[in-house]
């Protein structure tokens, strides 16, 4: 595992990356839950997904959205976080040019961002969404 600071739209983005030794193996980007509720790339479920994807042979990256950990910037209600995810995906693809398989996985808020990224990036051909929270029920 390598600690990274990736140039992002609002400054650097803190990330953890594990590269598979074969350049043509699949890649995956993992997205964490709501930063305003304590979500980080170290959240238990995100960390477990990270280990599972590595074991499955993926080159795997998880990162902190803007304003979390060492990532610069401020929470942007999803718009900026989508830009962060796109930037990290660009970085991942740049270092894995022979990979034909690209996945995105997200937990809660990260799942919501993952769905948006999936709709905008046709090269993504696999995804995992966990516990998507849309809104509070009305009474």
Features from the language model and the residues they span:
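Residue-level detector of conserved catalytic or cofactor/ligand-binding positions
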Residues: 132-138
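A conserved short beta-strand
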Residues: 123-132
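Alpha/beta-hydrolase fold nucleophile elbow
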Residues: 97-107
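Gly/Ala-rich beta-loop-alpha elbow adjacent to hydrolase catalytic centers
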Residues: 106-114
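Alpha/beta-hydrolase active-site loop
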Residues: 76-95
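N-terminal cap/lid segment of alpha/beta-hydrolase-fold proteins
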Residues: 1-23
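Short, surface-exposed "cap/lid" segments of acyl-processing enzymes
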Residues: 22-58
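Short beta-to-alpha linker loops that shape the active-site pocket of alpha/beta-hydrolase fold enzymes
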Residues: 34, 64-69
